[in-house]
Amino acid sequence: MDALTWITAGSLAAWVWLLFGQGLFWRTDVRLPPRVPPGQWPSVAIVVPARDEAEALRSSLPSLLAQDYPGRAEIFLVDDGSTDGTGELARALAEEHGGLSLTVDSPGEPQPGWTGKLWAVRHGMALARARTDAQYYLLTDADIAHAPDSLRELVSAAWSGELDLVSQMARLRVAAFWERLIVPAFVYFFAQLYPFRRINRPGARTTAAAGGCVLLRREAAERAGVPERIRGAVIDDVALARAVRRAGGRIWLGLADRVHSVRPYPGLGPLWRMVSRSAYAQLRHRPLVMAGTVAGLAVVYLVPPVAVVAGALTGDVVPLVAGAAAWAVMAGTFVPMLRYYRQPPALAVVLPFTALLYLLMTVDSAVQHYRGRGAAWKGRTYARPEAAP
């Protein structure tokens, strides 16, 4: 057999393993676990770091103010050096909509070694400790909107399962062409890297969270020493989950039904920056890991369609059949995520093209890192950030 046949056979074998051996990552049925309401509702501090988020807050903050929570809950919005009137708008929205109590404050510029977001989270948690007796923190991004019962259901899940961290991957916006092409694949690749079922096993080595929506027990945060212990992490959600688990905490991660992002990504550029800003940090800035990742993406996602085309042109049946089988398994595993995002299953066929884009984003992330522009976000650049300690 020639080289293409061998490589295609390897790709097919990889897909058979991914289908059964990677924690059934492709299934989308991991939602909040069975839960019952606590006898006495614990108090919660909702911490929202925000930097130039005025546009998103118009849709997201009213949903937090309107939380139907039987216990005490307060919102601490940390204005991280915004220039678009984020803090002023937040106060105006609170006055207009009423609901939960809102405190808006600013921590000043981050100290050396801190990322801006974690510096803001630190400030919000400190305010909550000083002003409330909160037993839980809800850490949620400024672009994340919550259904009225979101907080109640998160707390019920944590209470029922004796969980220290409950995280939901918010349903991202899918409306524009590039959003439909990129976003479902983004969540699919995340689940492939961090299979939810595997993460949710007590004591599992695989650990992650989704930073847009994290309910964290205060005692667990103090035991884990967060956010101080992860102050330089760009991939802060994964770092947070690892710190909590290392300290003996129990975590849960799944897909959201009541939480969604309001942030639009109307073109390829914003989506590209979202992925590339942290892709190389995820690989811990190691060139050999980068090379292996690129090679793996090529073999797993790009070889099947190449083998089909080459086999059809040359009349070589073996790579054609093996490539078609690998491509079919690939597409089949992507269909549940497309359905979760209410997209046509036919889009699964173009997953190799989307994977190629992600490969290029990863390469670009490394290039920007070595140019001193790694992890650029919201006007800040972290030349050599930590990934997830």
Range-by-range predicted roles:
Residues 158-192, 219-222, 226-290, 375, ...:
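Catalytic donor/gating beta->alpha subdomain of glycosyltransferases that bind UDP-sugars
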Residues 290-372:
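Membrane-embedded multi-pass helical conduit in multi-pass membrane proteins
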Residues 1-40, 183-184, 192, 196, ...:
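N-terminal membrane-anchoring/stem segments of glycan-assembly enzymes
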Residues 121, 137:
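Short aromatic/hydrophobic "clamp" motif used to bind/position activated sugar donors
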Residues 42-45, 74:
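Cell-envelope/extracellular polymer assembly enzymes that use nucleotide-activated donors
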Residues 85, 140-157:
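Acidic donor-binding/catalytic loop of UDP-sugar-dependent glycosyltransferases
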Residues 62-72:
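Short, acidic, metal-binding catalytic loop of nucleotide-sugar glycosyltransferases
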Residues 70, 79-89, 108-110:
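A conserved acidic beta->alpha catalytic loop
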